[in-house]
Amino acid sequence: MKFSEKWLRSWANPQVSHDELVARLSMVGLEVDADLPVAGAFSGVVVGEVLSTEQHPDADKLRVCQVSNGSETFQVVCGAPNVRAGLKIPFAMIGAELPDDFKIKKAKLRGVESFGMLCSAKELQISEENAGLLELPADAPVGQDVRTYLELADYTIEVGLTPNRGDCLSLAGLAREVSAIYDVPLAPVAVDAVAAQHDETRPVELAAPAACPRYLGRVIRNVDLSRPTPLWMVERLRRSDIRSIDPVVDVTNYVMIELGQPMHAFDLAEINGGVRVRMAEDGEKLVLLDGQEITLRADTLVIADHQRALAIAGVMGGEHSGVSDSTRDLFLEAAFFDTIALAGKARSYGLHTDSSHRFERGVDSQLARKAMERATRLILDIVGGEPGPIVEQVSEAHLPKVAPITLRAERVTQMLGMPLDAAEIVRLLQALELTVVADGEGQWSVGVPSHRFDISLEVDLIEELARLYGYNRLPVRYPQARLAPNNKPEARAALPLLRRLLVARGYQEAITFSFIDPALFELFDPGTQPLTLANPISADMAAMRSSLWPGLVKALQHNLNRQQSRVRLFESGLRFVGQLEGLKQEAMLAGAICGKRLPEGWANGRDGVDFFDAKADVEAVLASAGALGDFSFVPGEHPALHPGQTARIEREGRLVGYLGALHPELAKKLDLEQPVFLFELLLAEVVDGHLPKFRELSRFPEVRRDLALLVDQDVPAQDILTQIRAAAGEWLTDLRLFDVYHGKGIDPHRKSLAVGLTWQHPSRTLNDDEVNSTTQNIVTSLEERFNATLRK
């Protein structure tokens, strides 16, 4: 909620400084996100009047103007497209200082002298409008200081409200808070009933009373929309971050900001028959005020006539029934819509308006008539017209009702940590316009006004007491708790350890959204139905991820597009598998690498990463819990990975993850030119390991044998190593694959695997006969199982 401080002080004016007011608002829960001057720092700028203009003799786009400051006439060269005789504008005379220390001096533009400058709103930092000069009203007093005339000694304050405080989405609500905080009088705007000048009405039917229990309408005839919106209203709207459109729309927006009641005005000539508040027909079409055509769903509340929908209730009006320059008669609407009925509807159509923002958070159910009278009076004052009687339809059974709440003094003491005086409790609650009636010793019955729809429980009342009394005045008491010993198994590798390990290996941690673009989901997990959000932040964040890879690859792509040629990212987080029925949320650890193997340097940084670099990182992660031997890498398939560079990561036969190169077709669709390698692991399987087993270092020599084995191309090296370990006996201390060869001198259907085996006995020296016998057993077992032979 953004508003003018000067406007707020016209309702409730505590004798405190701007800074103190801002600080106090934040302290009572109305957190101030921003407070800025309404204009830049400038001086020497007055209201000027352009008396005449003529073409510059040496520039097509410049005009030579004669400008009056009320006492003298000055020649000013101006290039603004809207400069014309009779226009009143901000005139910066010689010696004036504009924002950013820009001083106005006598100048010569293309040979013509200029004695000052005519200013746009942007040049004075009043707004971002820069299409031409800031046009002032025709009755602006020539010669008056612009800061005085526009009342620029003001601040715009923006408060970030929690969803339950919809009552503060208006000047009236904020003024009530300020009045209560500082115990100063509240001076609301006077709203009197406007007498009808004719009998014309339009019948109103509530076909969906649960969604719209109250609807008011009024016909106003013979309005003149050629009249401008007065400057005071335009300025108050601008300082509330609302652009002036036309007098009628400006009035409805003004009343919304002032009182908190969203309103809408229809062109009466476009309403066929009466007004029906109903649910939309499934598939019904409506062109909105912003020009987009939408297809309505049956769960959407609409304002309609007897032929078609006119507006999405509480969200946006339709284009064909909207007010235009040719409108002469209005149908003015004010209604109360149920919060639940409108919740999420705007977002479901890709919309968000000031009206929907308020109705979704709650609007005073008793406010509509007051807002109707206020808007009617403003419209009559600005564009004239003849008002008719108000037509109101109400379903009392569906209006919200709040029963009195019992407040106990002992409960207040218990929750605040200190007693509050009974008189103080009554004073604070009455300051918020709550009715308080004593109901026994230390107990009250509290009535809640219709605008405080966030208060329904005793704890809500106690929260209000704490806010107004001051959180900073409550006693500080530290919580007392028993510290329990850490029962985490010693064999468990915690996630922080894995994070540090990957960082040490050159990775950087990424955090990406759990919801992704459905199109990206389909690329990584084709054929799987994603779990979609009913009310996503945006259309490209509508699917819950079934893998961490989509977010990681997008982050990697983002870095590559910003001249980062070597990228190594990892992420830990949840993936979501299945639909709501039987949904699995699994903690995962994933990584993505591309670019050079090592940072650029004189002795390295030339070779790119490959499959085995990613595999080495995965092995380091798996080894962190001391259970690397439980895992194996098995050739596999995954739709997002290269068909020839994909490994299933298994733990004792259970699938725990995947490792591989990004599929070339997927890389092409994502415009990734460099090879990208990915891994993803089930975190629960990775962190559970084994305690290390300690044994005495052997004092006896090691014995090593190297074997060059010829096997078929399709035999995984992992299977060979597993078989060797099984046949090598208990004294095998190290086994390494140090070479893979296929080419000249080798059958094209075979490959050569060179492995090194190291044995060491803890209490004696192994002799050659023992080692040779074991080696022969290994060769025999490999020959029997894999048709392996020694390379000669």
Curated annotation (Swiss-Prot):
Residues 39-147 form the tRNA-binding domain. Binds 2 magnesium ions per tetramer. GO terms for cellular component: phenylalanine-tRNA ligase complex. InterPro entries: aa-tRNA-synth_II/BPL/LPL, B3/B4_tRNA-bd, DNA-bd_dom_put_sf, Fdx_antiC-bd, Fdx_antiC-bd_sf, NA-bd_OB-fold, Phe-tRNA-ligase_IIc_bsu, Phe-tRNA-ligase_IIc_bsu_bact. Its EC number is 6.1.1.20. It comes from the Bacteria. Its cofactor is Mg(2+). Mg(2+) binds at D454, D460, E463, E464. It catalyses: tRNA(Phe) + L-phenylalanine + ATP = L-phenylalanyl-tRNA(Phe) + AMP + diphosphate + H(+). It is an enzyme of class 6 (ligase). GO terms for molecular function: ATP binding; magnesium ion binding; phenylalanine-tRNA ligase activity; tRNA binding. Keywords: Aminoacyl-tRNA synthetase, ATP-binding, Cytoplasm, Ligase, Magnesium, Metal-binding, Nucleotide-binding, Protein biosynthesis, RNA-binding, tRNA-binding. GO terms for biological process: phenylalanyl-tRNA aminoacylation. SUPFAM superfamilies: Anticodon-binding domain of PheRS (SSF54991), Class II aaRS and biotin synthetases (SSF55681), Nucleic acid-binding proteins (SSF50249), PheT/TilS domain (SSF56037), Putative DNA-binding domain (SSF46955). Signal peptide: none annotated. Gene3D superfamilies: 3.30.56.10, Bira Bifunctional Protein, Domain 2 (3.30.930.10), Ferrodoxin-fold anticodon-binding domain (3.30.70.380), Nucleic acid-binding proteins (2.40.50.140), Phenylalanyl-trna Synthetase, Chain B, domain 3 (3.50.40.10). Residues 698-791 form the FDX-ACB domain. Pfam families: B3_4, B5, FDX-ACB, tRNA_bind, tRNA_synthFbeta. Tetramer of two alpha and two beta subunits. Belongs to the phenylalanyl-tRNA synthetase beta subunit family. Type 1 subfamily. This is Phenylalanine--tRNA ligase beta subunit.
